């Protein structure tokens, strides 16, 4: 147990700093865990699978007895064990990706716990010496020369084939894509075209090149819209000092309607006929409210606007 306590104490000093527990507190915690049967062997302390049961048991004991000494010590030890394990896994993964060996991901054992600075320097020196001794024979080895062999007979030296220096046959395409190898030959049959000269363009009356897409005739579209669309009519507007005011399109009709409303009221047959004639024209709601302002008085117009809205 002394060796385990020493390793755990060293790890706590490395990762916990000034808050690391003493060896006496660590020993008391380990004895309590063995007494309660949470640790069959001290090596089980390094297994992550036993951390949760230990935490649960110590938490329950602290709640029942009201003593949290072992729980506090276990919290510091657990933090040190997790930090050491993460550092070991990260180091092994880095070695694996860099091709330096390692790459295992497993629960850390006693050898995975952080060692003191002196031991780390000694181990680092031994590893460097071993790596240098392993790489030395490979560096001093003479490089092998690879001889070139004949393409037909396979003889490296003394080939008498007439086609020994002939290049391999050209690559034949699969036929999925068109080849441009014969385009230059077809152009060269009619004469060499100097570099930078403009290629002759196909005339409109000649065949040989597919015509391009037809352009949109916007002028024709505008004429068709102007002939088939609704007529565009602008309402006359008079600009006054207080702002724009509506001008009736039919002054005589508006004047007659105003006179009929003034003489017989809104319910008179003449007024109703005049209103129907006025409403038969394509007027917008804003255009309807303007003649009512002219025909009606201030009070009837206010009542009519409330009913209209």
From Swiss-Prot:
Species of origin: Fujinami sarcoma virus
Single GO cellular component term: viral capsid
Gene3D superfamilies the UniProt entry points to: Human Immunodeficiency Virus Type 1 Capsid Protein (1.10.375.10), Immunodeficiency lentiviruses, gag gene matrix protein p17 (1.10.150.90)
Region (Disordered): 127-146, 177-213
Domain comment as written in the entry: Late-budding domains (L domains) are short sequence motifs essential for viral particle budding. They recruit proteins of the host ESCRT machinery (Endosomal Sorting Complex Required for Transport) or ESCRT-associated proteins. Gag-p19 contains one L domain: a PPXY motif which potentially interacts with the WW domain 3 of NEDD4 E3 ubiquitin ligase (Potential).
Protein name: Gag polyprotein
A Pfam short name: Gag_p24
Keywords (A to Z) from UniProt: Capsid protein, Host-virus interaction, Viral budding, Viral budding via the host ESCRT complexes, Viral matrix protein, Viral release from host cell, Virion
Short sequence motif named PPXY motif, residue ranges: 168-171
């Amino acid at each position: 147990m002394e060796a385990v306590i020493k390793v755990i104490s060293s790890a706590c000093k490395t990762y916990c700093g000034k808050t690391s527990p003493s060896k006496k507190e660590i020993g008391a915690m380990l004895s309590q865990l063995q007494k309660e049967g949470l640790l069959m062997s001290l090596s089980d302390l390094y297994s992550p699978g036993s951390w949760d049961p230990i935490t649960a048991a110590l938490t329950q004991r602290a709640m029942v007895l009201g003593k949290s000494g072992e729980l506090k010590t276990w919290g510091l030890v657990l933090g040190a064990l997790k930090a050491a394990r993460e550092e070991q896994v990260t180091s092994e993964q880095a070695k694996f990706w860099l091709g330096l060996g390692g790459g295992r991901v497993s629960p850390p054992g006693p050898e995975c716990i952080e060692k003191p600075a002196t031991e780390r320097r000694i181990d680092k020196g031994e590893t460097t010496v071993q790596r240098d001794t392993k790489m030395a024979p490979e560096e001093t080895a003479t490089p092998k020369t690879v001889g070139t062999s004949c393409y037909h007979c396979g003889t490296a030296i003394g080939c008498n084939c007439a086609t020994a220096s002939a290049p391999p046959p050209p690559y034949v395409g699969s036929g999925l894509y068109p080849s441009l190898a014969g385009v230059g030959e077809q152009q060269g049959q009619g004469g060499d075209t100097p570099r930078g000269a403009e290629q002759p363009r196909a005339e409109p009356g000649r065949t040989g090149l597919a015509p391009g897409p037809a352009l949109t005739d916007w002028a024709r579209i505008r004429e068709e819209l102007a002939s088939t669309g609704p007529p565009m009519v602008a309402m006359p507007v008079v600009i006054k000092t207080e702002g724009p005011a509506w001008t009736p399109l039919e002054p005589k009709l508006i004047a007659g309607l105003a006179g009929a409303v003034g003489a017989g009221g809104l319910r008179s047959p003449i007024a109703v006929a005049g209103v129907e004639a006025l409403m038969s024209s394509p007027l917008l709601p804003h255009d309807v409210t303007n003649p009512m302002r002219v025909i009606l008085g201030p009070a009837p117009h206010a009542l009519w606007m409330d009913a209209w809205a």
